[in-house]
Design a protein with these regions (language model features):
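Metal-dependent amide/peptide-bond hydrolase catalytic core
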Residues: 1-159
């Protein structure tokens, strides 16, 4: 029914940010707003981000040097026209934990073409209707291998 005030409220969600600083700011503001609204309404309120049991995913931020290396390797293999720079993703990604510990570059491969139902209907990777063009998989594997081989070739003496 409308206008009924519940005894208690509990809700959850996912927070995403392009930077770790942005995530910290979101957490700070959510806590301030929840506690402030509880105080205004003369009731108790609190926030539990469950950081002890479920660490927040850090932002995936490419290291500039590793990004330049990965892009150069991909362009060498595919040509400059075969590489597109995409906007930063808002997804929660395990790779952020790696990137926080060492210079890293996160990139994706295009797996659609004009004939796949995913491309025609704009189905994203989380859709049950998402279909990939499997011909892209060997190309993606080759790009990943080229990035690794080029890196090892350049840095073999320092390892």
């Amino acid at each position: 029914a409308y206008n009924v005030i519940p005894q208690s409220v509990e809700f959850g969600g996912t927070m995403r940010s392009m930077t770790d600083e942005g995530l910290a700011y979101l957490m700070k503001r959510i806590k301030e707003i929840v506690e402030g609204q509880a105080a205004v309404n003369r009731c108790g309120g609190g926030v539990d981000f469950m950081e002890e049991s479920m660490r927040p995913y850090p932002a995936v931020v490419n290291d500039e040097g590793m990004y330049a290396h990965a892009r150069a390797s991909a362009e060498r293999l595919l040509g400059a026209g075969g590489v597109r720079v995409a906007p930063q993703l808002m997804g929660a990604e395990d790779f952020g934990f790696y990137a926080a510990r060492m210079p890293s570059a996160f990139f994706t491969i295009g797996v659609g073409n004009a004939t796949t139902s995913s491309a025609r209907a704009a189905h994203t990777t989380h859709s049950p209707h998402f279909v990939i063009d499997e011909a892209a998989l060997p190309v993606g594997a080759a790009v990943h291998a080229a990035v690794a081989i080029d890196y090892l070739s350049k840095h073999a003496s320092s390892m």
